[in-house]
Amino acid sequence: SLAIASIAAAHPFPNRMAGMHFFNPATIMKLVEVVETTVTDAETIQVLVQLGKDLGKVPVVCKDSPGFIVNRVARPYYIESLRLAEEGVAIPVIDALLAAAGFKMGPFRLMDLLGNDINYAVSCGVYEQLGEPGRLKPSFIQQQKVAQGKLGRKSGAGYYTYNK
């Protein structure tokens, strides 16, 4: 996860710097986080909120923090699912149970869709930026998938196998 304040610090007009965080797949997902720093002016936020609306998105203004809102809240969802797999619960069972509980897809199908490399990098970044809390420690299973090149749909294999 990028720190918008770090980018803004190098900009000649940091008050005109903010972020827009779209969700994958961006053509389908309606949510966009509009990320403000401590120096972002209100006009910049208004422009980005309107841009989000013009793009057919639902903009939510949030503070510049590790993972912003969605990625920070999603970390425990992924990490606890990975911990269950480490404890021997079958991945298809975890996905099926969470899909039956109302999630659009289970966590492993979602990680494969997003890309295991991206998801693992975000997990590591949020973990480090928040001071390495044990509850957010990235999973060894996910680290292995990335090391093996099993990045999900984009590589043809991840937690599941896909036809390219």
Residue map of PLM features:
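N-terminal glycine-rich phosphate-binding loop for ADP-containing cofactors
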Residues: 1-164
